[in-house]
Amino acid sequence: MIPEHFKQNTSLEISVFGFPVQMDYMFYWPEKREHDQKDPLVSHIEYRAESGIVSETGYRSHFFFTQALVGTDYKTIAELVTGIAENLAIENGYQSPARGQMTLF
């Protein structure tokens, strides 16, 4: 069963490897229409950043199957979307700098 705290739509500012990222999390995508609506099969996250951390343009749209939330170790929406964003950043070519090294990304 999907934990109740994931069943909402919200906007947050998160930090992805030290870079600020605006995020819109939409469990009910595109929106919740009925009070007793069944859980959706797919949910959506939009990431926007001034830096190119999540994509070259600073914008990234990500869909995921809500079934992935069943039994997850993530305790909050912020943890979930930060974990996904960090994976997207690595997929985008981000490499964390060595200890003490500055980054130009």
Where in this protein do the model-derived segments appear?
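Short, hydrophobic/π-rich interface segment
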Residues: 1-5
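Amphipathic, interaction-prone secondary-structure segments
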Residues: 6-39
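Acidic, low-complexity intrinsically disordered segments
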Residues: 44-105
